């Protein structure tokens, strides 16, 4: 989620497919399917070219929609078609999902992680960078005004803490420190 201009996607395609110009490589590590969600249609076109560069059209695709819209549709269709076999359920994303990587701006990350966790399969993994930890006194948002950038960080981080508290009660949560931040790895327990 959050394909950007494809840096992470390109790295994963290199891992799964090898260098596209080296025809002698025979790497078969690719997943059954790989769906890249990118809200911006412009970046979606760039990622689509990346998919074609790696000849990955048969198992990967890009969806140019907001993540919140996709998860709302997937959840609704799943509930409406619960009695149908999974192959007959219309959805942008086949459920359940075994791995979701969220790479969105800090302010969007907590809500995206929460909705991603909701469609994760039992034993599925969610990988998401922790939002930046806010520092200093930022005051309170004034009524009728947009919060400042610092206040938005605090709001996002508080949502993140609430999400982590909720999922850590019954699921496995790990944190890995990286240069420039912390990566959260959340495993949904069956």
Residue ranges and their predicted role:
Residues 10, 14, 75, 110-114:
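Amphipathic, non-transmembrane alpha-helical secondary structure
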Residues 16-17, 52-56, 79-82, 144-150:
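Short, hinge-like loop/turn segments at secondary-structure boundaries
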Residues 75-99:
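A short acidic, Gly/Pro-enriched loop at the edge of an enzyme's catalytic core
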Residues 100-106:
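Switch II (G3) loop of P-loop NTPases
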Residues 49, 76, 138-142:
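Short aromatic-enriched loop/helix-cap "lid" or pocket-rim segments at secondary-structure transitions
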Residues 1-72:
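SAM cofactor-binding core of SAM-dependent methyltransferases
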């Amino acid at each position: 989620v959050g394909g950007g201009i494809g840096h992470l996607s390109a790295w994963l395609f290199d891992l799964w497919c090898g260098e596209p110009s080296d025809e002698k490589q025979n790497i078969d590590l690719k997943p059954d399917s790989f769906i890249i969600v990118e809200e911006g249609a412009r970046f979606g076109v760039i990622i689509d070219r990346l998919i074609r560069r790696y000849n990955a059209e048969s198992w990967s695709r890009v969806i140019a929609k907001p993540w919140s819209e996709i998860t709302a549709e997937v959840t609704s269709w799943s509930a409406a078609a619960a009695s149908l076999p999974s192959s007959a359920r219309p959805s942008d994303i086949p459920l359940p999902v075994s791995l979701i990587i969220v790479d969105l701006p800090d302010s969007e990350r907590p809500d995206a992680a929460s909705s991603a966790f909701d469609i994760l399969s039992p034993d599925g993994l969610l990988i998401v960078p922790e939002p930046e930890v806010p520092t200093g006194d930022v005051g309170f948002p004034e009524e009728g005004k947009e919060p400042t950038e610092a206040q938005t960080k605090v709001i996002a981080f508080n949502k993140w803490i609430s999400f982590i508290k909720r999922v850590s009660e019954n699921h496995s949560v790990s944190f890995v420190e990286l240069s420039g931040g912390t990566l959260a790895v959340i495993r949904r327990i069956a």
